[in-house]
Amino acid sequence: MRCAWLVLFFLACGAPVVPDAGPSGGGQLASDAGGPTDAGLTTDAGSVTDAGSTNDAGTTDAGGITTVLRVTYTAGAHTLFVRGSLPPLNWNTGVPMVKENDTTWSISLTGLAAGAALEWKPVLNDATWSKGPNYRAAGSSTVEVAPRFVRDAGEWSRRWPSFTSTLLMNTRGVYVYLPPTYLENSTASMPVVYMHDGQNLFDPAAAFGGVTWRVPESMNDAASSGRFREAIVIGVENAGGARIAEYTPTVDTSVGGGGRGDLYLRMLVEELKPMVDSSFRTRSGPRDTVLIGSSLGGLISSYAGISGAGTFGCIGAMSPSVWWDNRVLLARLSQSGATRPALVYVDSGDSGPSNDGVGNTADLAAAYRALGYVEGSTLKYVVQQGATHTESAWASRLPGALEFLLGPAR
């Protein structure tokens, strides 16, 4: 069984962003190589202009604050410049950055007014703008970014077609999506989003009913707009006939099965995650490790947040099967101790069979509030009017869930 959910709004970038080409479709997974080639560098004539600003490679009023901008990128023989919204920067002509080593460039800006919000972009050879939204800096601080200048889209593949678990004693495929900045910039490390039912995420030929969650499209769109941080996505296929057992924490006698959820989560934490972290440049802490699923996948995701060692710090439960085993999840939540995720996203539709479990989902959101979660801060609860328990409904709400769990790109 599956459920559905809604995303209401997304954050817009408020200040002008240098336009670049929109994302193109990702193909099969390429090698983990970084850095641009000369053929890939083009001037972006659509850059933001500021007729009132002039180039000043020095500093301004010494009474202001100092902000350090640091860029990590393997530029080779190229040079990095920076343009921005406030003096001593401007949008017309770049100020050269100082090369600290082969992968690090920096510039110190002195004299910025306290509280001033600087928008800025690295520019390669003062000709090729970085992709994606403007970066922001405010106050006396050091801001470090890992940009990209060439790639518009990430790539995905069924990276491990025969991943074998010794804990579960079975084999399944694992899909991997790598975002564009990761593929271009060898200094970039990324948060990781683990998702259940991997068959339904990427490939229409493998998806239930031929309808996917449009994961590559959503990730590539966000990489361009900055709606949420770029991330590696790990799509873990379900094990077919073992799906119900693996996605449930207890046996439900009314269904006649279930109860291997703890073992399934151990597989994710003890077998799959170490392989992912050793294969890719990941940010492996709980705040950068997201777990998302729908229906029974939403049930096991919510359960994962309060069990184990707190590996998954951000939980997405879409149309979760709260009804399982007389709503055992709600009982477990009320008994949960110190292990709790930092962020929780819960949603459903309100139409179709059982109204997509909207009543149970509302009770789940209430249970999180009773634990101290605050709506809009550490909890987001969404009901999508008219939505049913379908892949297309989950696909439509996925960007909103990721926006909350990953946070916007800076």
Language-model regions, residue ranges each:
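Sec-dependent bacterial lipoprotein signal peptides
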Residues: M1-L11
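Short Gly/Pro-enriched loop/turn and capping motifs at secondary-structure junctions
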Residues: W5-L6, A127-T128, S351-P353
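Ser/Thr-rich, Pro/Gly/Ala-heavy low-complexity intrinsically disordered linkers and tails
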Residues: F10-G64
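Extracellular beta-sheet/turn segments enriched in Thr/Pro/Gly and aliphatic residues
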Residues: A21, A57, A138-G154
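A short, amphipathic beta-strand motif
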Residues: I65-Y73
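Aromatic-rich carbohydrate-binding modules that target alpha-glucans
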Residues: Y73-A117, L124-T142
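Non-catalytic cap/lid and distal C-terminal segments of serine-dependent acyl enzymes
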Residues: G76-P87, E100-I107, V150-R410
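N-terminal carbohydrate-binding/catalytic regions of secreted carbohydrate-active enzymes
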Residues: G115-A116, K121-V123, V176-Y177, S186
